[in-house]
């Protein structure tokens, strides 16, 4: 809803599987994405916590389980992009052709795990501390503070202090994170793009089943 009361429907796209053979690429580049909430949605802080737990740093599930423990990727992370009317939660992984299918399977497994059971208190605590630390660092410079003020005025018409934002982060519960996982991680909503020297590589929608 805009400030003048006009309501626009959220943008809608089709969730496709795109496979592109690029022989010049040394790695296989994998990107999965699901729709998420808008920048002003009431669950925006829980969205950031979910992203942090999934792939937002070296202590995240994707990094620890797929890169550190199994060594299947060169890099892996998730990111949250939020706009006025919609958003996108995306996961990137760089790997080899031999391990590409396994990496996709393990990402889908993490989707399932986040849906199956609430995050434990220790992991939730780490995610909150990480997110608050990142927020504080992002507002250290004058230019970043001015950008934050402008963004808040554009999207909210008001200013949220650092204390207000950190308090909202603290209010996020494990049940809220699990609820968002159920909302976002729907097999029908997952978009997948794979680029690389793929040599006949194929993947089906059934392989993305996270229910």
Predicted regions and their residues:
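Charged substrate- and nucleic-acid-binding regions of tRNA-handling and nucleotidyl-transfer enzymes
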Residues: 156, 178-179, 188-195
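Double-stranded RNA-binding/processing signature
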Residues: 44
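C-terminal subdomains that position terminal phosphate/3'-OH groups for nucleotidyl transfer/ligation
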Residues: 111
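Short acidic/His-enriched helical or mixed secondary-structure segments at domain edges of catalytic enzymes
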Residues: 68-69, 73, 114-167
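A short, acidic, flexible beta-alpha connecting loop/helix-capping segment that sits on the rim
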Residues: 195-201
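Non-catalytic beta-strand/loop surface segments
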Residues: 1-41, 52-105, 123, 144, ...
């Amino acid at each position: 809803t805009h400030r003048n009361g006009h309501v626009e429907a959220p943008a809608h796209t089709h969730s496709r599987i795109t496979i592109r053979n690029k022989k010049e690429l040394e790695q296989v580049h994998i990107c999965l994405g699901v729709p998420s909430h808008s920048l002003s949605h009431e669950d925006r802080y829980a969205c950031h916590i979910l992203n942090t737990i999934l792939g937002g740093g070296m202590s995240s599930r994707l990094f620890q389980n797929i890169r550190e423990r199994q060594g299947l990727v060169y890099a892996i992370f998730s990111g949250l992009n939020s706009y006025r009317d919609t958003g996108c939660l995306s996961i990137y992984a760089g790997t080899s052709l031999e391990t590409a299918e396994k990496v996709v399977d393990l990402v889908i497994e993490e989707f399932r795990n986040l849906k199956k059971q609430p995050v434990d208190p220790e992991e939730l605590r780490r995610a909150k501390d990480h997110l608050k630390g990142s927020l504080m660092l992002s507002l250290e410079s004058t230019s970043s503070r001015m950008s934050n003020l402008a963004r808040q005025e554009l999207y909210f018409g008001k200013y949220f202090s650092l204390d207000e934002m950190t308090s909202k982060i603290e209010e996020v519960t494990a049940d809220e994170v699990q609820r968002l996982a159920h909302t976002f991680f729907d097999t029908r909503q997952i978009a997948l793009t794979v680029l690389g020297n793929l040599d006949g590589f194929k993947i089906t929608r059934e392989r993305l089943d996270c229910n």
